[in-house]
């Protein structure tokens, strides 16, 4: 199996709302920085989603996550892609896997004994197209070294790591191991920095990946 890109990342279902400028004030009241990604708990996210539904109606749902978006784009341009991630056996997880197959992305989905749902990213898009994201990682945060497909990494031209993985200790350790395997086998490594607040908050962890 020869691949162009092998990647690991947070598998998140995108829940997207188009908001108006007035909602920016409500975000400020909730201490959610406009234009950035903030990690929140499940109950907080559900409460905010219900608030948005009341004001803007039903959201758009789609397969998301930083690495996923990059792989879908690469696949649509003809690259052979492979993805390692974690979702639950819930409706969101099933829809996620179906979307990857639709986009011709080979994948190894890992199951977890943890009673956690598939992760979700609440995306609020303002009139000027700026995105504010509130993410609940769910089961994706349990991605670990045992989930890696060493063969897929070795047989790829590139290993792509999304910077958001540094927010989970087990995912960070998996990223470090994957990079070591890649470098040992002459596979080029690409790392996204994801967001300014991720770099500021996890500077040492990101340096550890370089």
Residue ranges and their predicted role:
Residues 1-82, 94-95:
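Glycine-rich phosphate/adenosyl-contacting loop at the front of the ribokinase-like
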Residues 3, 75, 101, 180-184:
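Anion (oxyanion) recognition and catalysis
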Residues 8-10, 86-89, 112, 125-127, ...:
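Cofactor-binding loop segments of dinucleotide-utilizing enzymes, especially the Rossmann-like FAD-
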Residues 81, 107, 189-190:
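Hydrophobic beta-strand scaffold residues
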Residues 99-116:
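A glycine-rich helix N-cap at a beta->alpha junction
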Residues 108-113, 123-169:
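Conserved phosphate-binding/catalytic loop of the ribokinase/pfkB sugar-kinase fold
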Residues 158-210:
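Conserved beta-alpha-beta core of the PfkB/ribokinase-like small-molecule kinase fold
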